[in-house]
Amino acid sequence: SVEDGMCAAAALVCRLPWMCCESRIVVRDGIEDQKEKEEIRQLLELCDQDFVPPLSHRNSTSQTNWAETEEKTDGIAEYLENICSQHVVLWKEEGVVRAFMTWKDHFNCENLEAYPDSCYLTTLCVWPDYRGQGISEVMYAEAEKDIAAKFPGSRITLRTWSTNGAQEHILDKLGCSLVRRLKDDRGEGIDTVYFVKKEENDR
């Protein structure tokens, strides 16, 4: 019946937490609010081991010498301070940060020499219960919109590791092209891969 169908649809929606509660996107040029900073810290700790290498073993969002990675006594504190000075897109539910994405402007590195002064997406974290629901795609779209408004004409770049299939699938859907691969950069069988957002005049 129609009633049964409506009940089934409602049940499906309520398996997606962010569709059942008040959620909103917040865009900032850095994090100063201590409550937001603490919520981001908790999210970083929760997602730490999802990254290769773990975030707690890194010293910045643009680190390239992975041989220097080691677990730090202060955990992710150094990494947290690094991202809080960057542009950020926050996904909040009921006023609590459940996902975030950060990016740098005027970014330059030798592995992206063909794309100088790009806007470089650095970190994306989504609370485990909120994954697989399209939030990552929304965050990418919001970052792209923010970049277009603040830095028109800048190319969008990012990197990940080759075994991160979930993110590479999203990047393909968003129209990003692989432009550099560093073989075994993060360990045997784990490459560092650089991407750039396609533009209309790209061939």
Predicted regions located by residue number:
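Acetyl-CoA-dependent GNAT
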Residues: 45-53, 61-128
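Conserved active-site alpha-helix within GNAT-family acetyltransferase domains
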Residues: 162-181
